[in-house]
Amino acid sequence: MKPIKRILIIRFRQIGDSILAIALCSTLKKSFPDAEIHFVLNKNIAPLYEGHPDIDKVITFDKNENKPFTAYIKKVWQVMHKNRYDVIIDMRSTIRTLFFSLFSLRTPFRIGRIKGYTHFLLNYRTDTYSKNLTTDMVQRNLLLAAPLEKIRPIQYTKEFKLYLTDR
């Protein structure tokens, strides 16, 4: 298998959930130190992640790029064709976020959550919402990295740190 060079993590919406996603970014950076980590977020929360040492690129969507739906699809298509990803981790796994995987079907690892409609586009689906799970949200997010253990052992970390910049 070829080396992992570029990883896309999709985590739109809430500020709290996106902060908890930093542990996944840090885990992936530790496990694949030569890979670029790209993080997709809503524009209004992106400044919290710019300059983070475990995130190489922040990709933002603003209100105008989310609606109308055609503008959203166009932006997703542009992102996916500008960057060739080896791994896509769709932390929300909604019908809207699955377009990232649709426009990148050759990506070897398209990882997300088990939902009734995700088996069409994700080749690795993780049960992070099972009623049997008693783990916290950070641990549930880290479960999304488990399929990458096929490549190498994953160095999990539950730390999530924010870094302040001068801006």
What are these regions (language model features)?
Residues M1-R167:
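Catalytic machinery of carbohydrate-active enzymes
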